[in-house]
A protein has these predicted regions:
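A short linear-motif detector with a strong N-terminal bias
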Residues: 15, 115-117, 161
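Small-residue (G/A/S/T)-rich helix-start motifs and N-terminal tracts that mark the onset
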Residues: 1-76, 132, 148, 154
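Acidic active-site catalytic centers that drive phospho-/nucleotidyl reactions
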Residues: 14, 24, 106, 140-143, ...
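Single conserved hydrophobic/aromatic residue that forms the stacking wall/gate
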Residues: 152-161
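Conserved beta-alpha-beta core of the PfkB/ribokinase-like small-molecule kinase fold
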Residues: 79, 83-151
Length: 161
C-alpha cells in the first residue's frame, strides 16, 4: 500500500464549507491524502457573500504551523487566504523552517465581484516575497490580472453589446 501524502493547508475558515480550509480539507481527503491545517482567519459567510472576517494573529498562525509539523512532516503545502502583510511574512518565516519544495498558492486576493480582499501592501508582499517560494499558483482571472500574469481583454460571455 502506498504511503499517504500529508498536506498542510494554510487558509481561512469558511463557515459555509464551500471554500477555504473546509473545502481544501475535503479535497485532500477525497484524493486519499492526510490534511493538516493552520487557520489564518475565521469568516462568517454563505453562498451569497461574506458577512465578517476575524483575522488570526500572525504568531498564532506560526504556532499552528509549527506544532502541526513537529510530528507529521508535510509532503506539500497549500496556501489560501493570507489577509495581511504581517500574516504573509509570518507564513514565509514558517515555510523557511519547514524546507518544503511543493508549495501551492491560491492567492485569495480578489472577490468574484472584483473587490480586493487584501490591501495593496499585502499584494505587494505576496508578489515580491511569497510567489518566489511557490511551486504552483492557482489564481482566478482577476487575481492573475492583479499579479500581472494575465491581461484579460475579451468581452465576457454576458457582454451582448
Amino acid at each position: 500500500m502506498k504511503p499517504q501524502s500529508k498536506i498542510l493547508i494554510i487558509a481561512g475558515s469558511d463557515s459555509s464549507g464551500g471554500a477555504g480550509i473546509q473545502a481544501d480539507g475535503k479535497t485532500v481527503t477525497a484524493l486519499g491524502s492526510y490534511a493538516m491545517t493552520a487557520i489564518t482567519a475565521v469568516t462568517s459567510q454563505n453562498t451569497t457573500g461574506v458577512k465578517s472576517v476575524v483575522p488570526i494573529k500572525p504568531r498564532e498562525i506560526e504556532k499552528q504551523i509549527e506544532f502541526s509539523c513537529i510530528d507529521i512532516k508535510p509532503d506539500a503545502i497549500k496556501i489560501g487566504m493570507l489577509h495581511s502583510t504581517k500574516v504573509i511574512l509570518s507564513v514565509i518565516k514558517s515555510l523557511k523552517k519547514l524546507k518544503i519544495k511543493k508549495i501551492i498558492l491560491d492567492p485569495v486576493m480578489v472577490a468574484k465581484g472584483g473587490a480586493n480582499l487584501i490591501n495593496s501592501s499585502a499584494i505587494k508582499t505576496l508578489k515580491s516575497k511569497l510567489i518566489k517560494q511557490t511551486f504552483l499558483i492557482t489564481p482566478n482571472i482577476p487575481e492573475a490580472e492583479v499579479l500581472g500574469c494575465l491581461l484579460y481583454t475579451s468581452p465576457s460571455p454576458r457582454d451582448d453589446r
